[in-house]
Regions:
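Cross-family detector of peptidyl-prolyl cis-trans isomerase
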Residues: 1-187
């Protein structure tokens, strides 16, 4: 499929002439070597354009996250830790606190800064069970602050979330994220 390979337009007369030359055995207007060089040049330019677009989107995502976290730090009830992780207590529990290697059972909802939801255990009607050493750094640090029964909102800078590469297909590079986390049980 030409569209999926990045070819957005084609000169149909030239294309038809090339196909006709191949099918009839005539001498094409452009040699196979020249055609290969033209395609190599085209795809190199396309790759450079896509890379520039991705870098611009990454820079915008990073700036958006930094601006949000700076403004969010001024809000009442929001605590900013030295790592840059921010949190707000919604409900304070009184049960056990986990360590960095604890297995925990949590309900959570993850959203982008614009409020778009990307994951939710609530939607699945089943809490998640995981080791705090098997999740993003913002979760490892943040959930340790909680006691069983607590519900916090975390504001996680990109470097404590999915970093400069993101999670392909799910989380863009440099994305700061919001999570509402309810610590049900330390296992």
């Amino acid at each position: 499929n030409m569209m999926s390979s990045g070819i957005r337009s084609i000169e149909f007369d030239d294309f038809a002439a090339g196909v006709k030359a191949v099918l009839t055995g005539a001498e094409p207007a452009v040699s196979f070597q020249e055609a290969g060089q033209l395609l190599d040049k085209y795809f190199a330019e396309l790759e450079a354009e896509q890379k520039a677009q991705a870098e611009a989107m990454s820079a915008a995502m990073r700036e958006e996250g930094e601006a949000f976290l700076k403004m969010n730090a001024e809000k009442e009830g929001v605590v900013t830790l030295p790592s840059g992780l921010q949190y707000k207590v919604i409900t304070e529990g009184s049960g056990k606190k986990p360590s960095a290697t604890s297995q925990v059972k949590c309900h959570y909802e993850g959203t982008f800064l614009n409020g778009a939801k990307f994951d939710s255990s609530y939607d699945r009607n089943e809490p998640a069970v995981f080791g705090l050493n098997q999740v993003i750094a913002g979760w490892t640090e943040g959930v340790q602050l909680m006691s069983e029964g607590s519900k916090y909102e975390f504001y996680i800078p990109y470097n404590l979330a999915y970093g400069e590469h993101g999670a392909p297909g799910a989380i863009p590079p440099y994305a700061a994220l919001k999570f509402v986390v309810e610590l049900i049980e330390v296992l």
